[in-house]
Regions:
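Short amphipathic alpha-helical interface segments enriched in basic and hydrophobic/aromatic residues
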Residues: 72-75, 172, 194-198, 313-317
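Short, solvent-exposed loop/helix junctions and linker helices
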Residues: 6, 90-93, 141, 183, ...
Length: 331
């Protein structure tokens, strides 16, 4: 039987696929390639290009493949300030609804959902735990919270079992440098610092007040991928639905990120510029992942800032144009 990974051509999803295949799992990937890259899909995975909102397409995948469980990474990006917020909400919610309906039709009752720490909003009491009440502020957090609630309602209605993983800032890349972060217009601090080091950006935009004075918990994408695989094992054992935070419990400032990047890259001066976003954000955000470590057996292996930036730099320097270079070679 196979694990279906929706969004398996995206950043975190592709790393989860590699981890599954390294563990000898059979994997099926579904991705619309709206933000993902076919070049990121492991060659041993069965790949279907299409949108999970397309019921006919999704049913064909379930007809063709013997699906045991699903990992859900697919998401339509939701800009913080955009007139597309409502349509992006609709795309994400409809995708989840269609996926759950087809899973139910084909008697697939296990799903791991890649959620986000953004569901917590701006909590006053730190560190946050899974018992902290979600109060999302940004559209990204709001839609993730609504999708989480859809899973909870599906469990009540017909017994679906789920694991929701609330991840903090994903970063780094596969140690092989075969896959990494390429989102076109990057919004993640570490990627933008490294793109500045490569000369692709004149300087690093540091958002005020969020990144300028705040501290953030950055989690290596390989550790996130491992947690999603452990969540599949949890469900295979017939255990109850769970929600887990995925964090290291150690936060870094933008200045620390830039200094570490200068050390790793050997480039002595990476210029930064403060940018006023006008968006209310938590200055410092810390969380506990003790529950995931205890119940899933999650043991992060890449949790040093230098290791994170080293792997990210290896990817960016080997692939300065992202997956675009692969398309040129294949063309």
């Amino acid at each position: 039987m196979s694990i279906l990974v929706v969004g398996g051509a995206g950043y975190i999803g592709s790393h989860a696929v590699y981890t599954l295949i390294e563990k000898k799992e059979k994997v099926v990937v579904v991705d619309s390639l709206a933000t993902g890259h076919a070049e990121a899909v492991h060659p041993e995975a069965a790949f279907y290009e299409g949108n999970i909102r397309d019921r006919h397409f999704l049913k064909q995948v379930f007809e063709n493949e013997d699906i045991e469980a699903v990992m859900h990474f697919a998401a339509s990006p939701i800009p913080l300030q955009s007139n597309r917020v409502f349509s992006s909400f609709n795309e994400n919610m409809t995708g989840m609804e269609t996926l759950l309906d087809v899973m139910k039709e084909y008697d697939v009752g296990r799903i791991v959902f890649a959620s986000s720490a953004a569901v917590y909003g701006c909590p006053q009491n730190l560190p946050v735990t899974e018992e902290t009440e979600p109060e999302p502020v940004h559209p990204h957090g709001k839609v993730k919270w609504m999708m989480e609630k859809m899973l909870m309602e599906a469990e009540k209605a017909y017994g679906l079992k789920y694991v929701i993983l609330r991840s903090f800032n994903a970063c780094g890349a596969h140690p092989s440098a075969f896959i990494g972060e390429d989102r076109g217009s990057e919004t993640h601090l570490i990627s933008n610092v490294l793109r500045t080091a490569l000369g692709h950006l004149p300087f690093v935009h540091i958002d005020q007040p969020e990144e300028a004075t705040g501290f953030r918990d950055y989690v290596h994408v390989q550790d996130l991928a491992e947690a999603h695989v452990l969540a599949i094992s949890h469900l295979r054992k017939g255990k109850d639905s769970r929600i887990y935070n995925l964090s290291y419990g150690e936060s870094y400032s933008a200045e620390q990120i830039i200094l570490a990047a200068q050390y790793v890259t050997g480039i002595p001066l990476i210029t930064a510029k403060l940018t006023e976003t006008g968006i209310d954000s938590q200055a410092t955000f810390a969380a506990s992942s003790s529950k995931a470590r205890k119940e899933l057996g999650w043991t992060p292996k890449h949790n040093s800032l230098i290791a994170i930036i080293r792997d990210a730099w290896n990817w960016h320097s080997a692939n300065p144009n992202g997956y675009a270079a692969e398309k040129v070679k294949q063309g």
